[in-house]
């Protein structure tokens, strides 16, 4: 089974485990690290996820994966918090984290409202409207970034 197929099936199985517990699947990674395949799930919930939450999800998911047995290679299962620099993956993330500091990287050079072209934008997330993410940049100007131009977006933690 291809990596993308595994990630897709894992997403479906994980959602069945997480949703009843009030947990959210943020991201699934299935990749080779050294000689070993690693299946890594990042999960979250309002107020943050605990180590006990991760352990419970790992146990339950491991049992289901052992029964379904659709991953043919040996792998290590890891369940983790998305961390302080949580990725923004879903449209709802751009609404939920409005007002927070984010870093957005785009696939191509884009201009802010003053015409400065860049691929990395750092600013306070205003929100998402009609498929466009709006940030108030650290320099004060606005940047409007089409969602389909975003390569990666993360919350940024300020010390």
From Swiss-Prot:
The keyword GTP-binding does not apply. It comes from the Bacteria. Keywords: Cytoplasm, Ribosome biogenesis. SUPFAM superfamilies: YhbC-like, C-terminal domain, YhbC-like, N-terminal domain. CDD domains: YlxS_C (cd01734). Transmembrane segments: none annotated. GO terms for biological process: ribosomal small subunit assembly; translation. InterPro entries: Ribosome_maturation_RimP, RimP_C, RimP_C_sf, RimP_N, RimP_N_sf. It holds the Pfam family DUF150_C. Belongs to the RimP family. Required for maturation of 30S ribosomal subunits. This is Ribosome maturation factor RimP. The lineage of its organism: Bacteria, Pseudomonadati, Thermodesulfobacteriota, Desulfuromonadia, Geobacterales. The gene is rimP.
